[in-house]
Amino acid sequence: MPDSALPPCSILLLAGGRGQRMGGRDKGLIEWQGLPLIAHLHRLVRPLTDDLIVSCNRNQERYAAYADRLVSDDSRDFPGPLAGIRAGLAVARHPWLLVLPCDAPRIDRALLETLLQAAGRTPARPWMLRCGGQWEPLFSLIPTHLAEEIEHAWRQGDRSPRHVLLPLGAEAIELAAGDPRLANLNTPELLANHRELK
């Protein structure tokens, strides 16, 4: 059950990419420390929501074990993470959608709670992590009432989550450059380098 002290949110785990840096392998299903990457995220976020969504474009039968429901891009050409965010916003049951990439297993509960607590301060605006001054839109918290504005930007041809969220008044949770919790393990080398880290 979700923590009642935090605002109710749906959570979207993005696992819909082509995995180009992994030689075409499905990143969310690659093992790290004995479990698929998606399993690490599932274990972390499951207590925070009763509406866990996974965006995936293949291996749906395997991802189903880690989600309350699955969504897929409405285009078959892997149009990028904003497509998954749109799909998540379309089905989210709560006022907020917490967005996370499937290949960041080192993010921790404390950071997610900081992001969720920020929601109470400006309920009309999206929040993103900003690491060393760099916006990280795939670690974001989006009010679901902004779905139509995001859809409008998509129809205008914008495919960048950062470009779409910033004009909506996005706020930042500031982190130091190189914060290891945001490490995307999206190449074989990064997976190997982080394999022994807890």
UniProtKB/Swiss-Prot annotation:
Its cofactor is Mg(2+). It comes from the Bacteria. Mg(2+) binds at residue 103. InterPro entries: MobA-like_NTP_Trfase, Molybde_CF_guanTrfase, Nucleotide-diphossugar_trans. It is an enzyme of class 2 (transferase). NCBIfam families: molyb_mobA (TIGR02665). Monomer. The N-terminal domain determines nucleotide recognition and specific binding, while the C-terminal domain determines the specific binding to the target protein. This is Molybdenum cofactor guanylyltransferase. It comes from Pseudomonas aeruginosa (strain LESB58).
